[in-house]
């Protein structure tokens, strides 16, 4: 059966990362042409160099996608970084770096992508947040604040773009198993796993499946919402 997403054009920031590359793979399975916007080239998928912190870089990347494909249907902001320390020990430079990638990057992406989407047939936007954006976590003030900012951004933009046939939502993963998290101390990984009600880590493919759903026909009445993919981690211990 032909996918309703077949031949759609997507951009995915952070497409070289574990989550971003899983999202690209999931969209490609639905027949989407998914372009990775990142500073490094992934193993597969169309690629456009982009520094999400820089307005000119984002503008040029979106313009290149429009020139190449003629439209833009799906936008996913999966680029994300973290710098961890208790607030009074967190360097200003680290705070700024996290905000510039996670939150400013989302703003710049939407600022340039929405005019292209509205010139076409509308589309879907998905921001990759974190359960820590809703609940906070010790030592992650910069990261948690940036992800909390995505919530307000999505809810506000949802009101602004609905009449343009554009829907925007957030996927909030819990602890995702990636090469980075696998390198952390066993005690840290065990603590995260203990919070999961289903007894396993979230995999990048789990996040990608949620993104695919929000981009598909089953999500036509969903906008400005948070979809948590955390195995119940945000509910706390039972």
Predicted features and spans:
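Substrate-binding pocket helix/loop in short-chain dehydrogenase/reductase
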Residues: 86-87, 94-96, 181, 192
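Active-site loop immediately N-terminal to the catalytic Tyr-X3-Lys motif
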Residues: 88, 135-141, 163-164, 199, ...
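Active-site helix of classical SDR
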Residues: 110, 146, 154
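Alpha-helical segment proximal to the catalytic Tyr-Lys
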Residues: 115, 159-160, 220
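Short, small/polar-rich loop/turn modules that mediate ligand/substrate recognition or access, typified
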Residues: 122, 162, 167, 222-224
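Residue(s) in the substrate-gating loop at a strand-loop-helix junction
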Residues: 130
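Short C-terminal tail/terminal secondary-structure segment
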Residues: 135, 212, 223-238
């Amino acid at each position: 059966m032909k996918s309703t997403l077949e031949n759609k054009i997507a951009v995915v920031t952070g497409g070289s990362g574990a989550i971003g590359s899983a999202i690209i793979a999931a969209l490609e399975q639905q027949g989407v042409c998914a372009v990775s916007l990142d500073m490094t080239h992934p193993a597969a998928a169309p690629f456009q160099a982009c520094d999400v912190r820089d307005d000119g870089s984002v503008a040029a990347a979106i313009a290149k996608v429009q020139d190449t494909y003629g439209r833009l249907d799906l936008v996913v902001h999966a680029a994300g970084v973290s710098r961890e320390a208790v607030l009074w020990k967190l360097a200003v430079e680290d705070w700024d770096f996290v905000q510039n990638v996670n939150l400013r990057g989302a703003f710049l992406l939407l600022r340039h992508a929405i005019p292209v989407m509205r010139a076409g047939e509308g589309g879907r936007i998905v921001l990759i947040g974190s359960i820590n954006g809703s609940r906070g976590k010790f030592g992650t003030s910069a990261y948690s604040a940036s992800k909390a900012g995505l919530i307000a951004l999505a809810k506000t933009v949802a009101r602004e773009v609905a009449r343009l046939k554009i829907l925007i939502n957030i996927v909030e993963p819990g602890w995702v198993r990636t090469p980075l998290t696998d390198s952390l101390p066993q005690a840290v990984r065990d603590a995260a796993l203990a919070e999961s009600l289903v007894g396993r880590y979230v995999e990048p493919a789990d996040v990608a499946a949620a993104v695919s759903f929000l981009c598909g026909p089953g999500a036509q009445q969903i906008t400005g919402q948070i979809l948590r993919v955390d195995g119940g981690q945000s509910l706390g211990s039972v």
